[in-house]
Amino acid sequence: MLATTPIDSIPDEFHRLMNGRLFNLLSWDQLTEFWAKINRDAGWYLYAVGEELPLVAAESGQVEKFIVEMDMLLRRDHDESYCGIVYADNLDNPSLIKIYDPNNLGSSCGSSKNPPLPGWIMSRVAPTGLQQKHALPASRKRWWQNLFNQD
């Protein structure tokens, strides 16, 4: 008799990447070098977890603006001598980047039984919804909603 797996239990490509092996960008210098390697034209979906799923990949100008604004937010709100809250599946040619919100870290390394979800995800694979346990703070919601409306 063959064992079968219910179709609902087979992870999609996005969840496979989300739950796969990730590498941490420990220093601010590493993060700066990493941002420079990101191909802005690679078809990135920009997703604020808890907000609406992006239906199309962002344009290169939107990706550039996201990276610049995200870098400023992280450096301002994560007032530490190290970064340590950005993870990627590949540090030279990533398909998925998890960015943890400095104001909702919990245990982002996954050592707790209920690690928090990242605040933002950059993915070259269309994301599927992730359920936040808590509502997105109003300040983060405003930041996200205004990100591309300031042009």
Which residues make up each language-model segment?
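Compact, well-ordered interaction domains used in eukaryotic information-processing assemblies
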Residues: 49-82
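Polybasic, proline/glycine-rich intrinsically disordered low-complexity segments
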Residues: 22-26, 30-31, 38, 94-151
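Non-membrane alpha-helical secondary structure
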Residues: 2, 6, 23, 55-62, ...
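Short, surface-exposed beta-edge/turn micro-motifs
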Residues: 41-44, 80-84
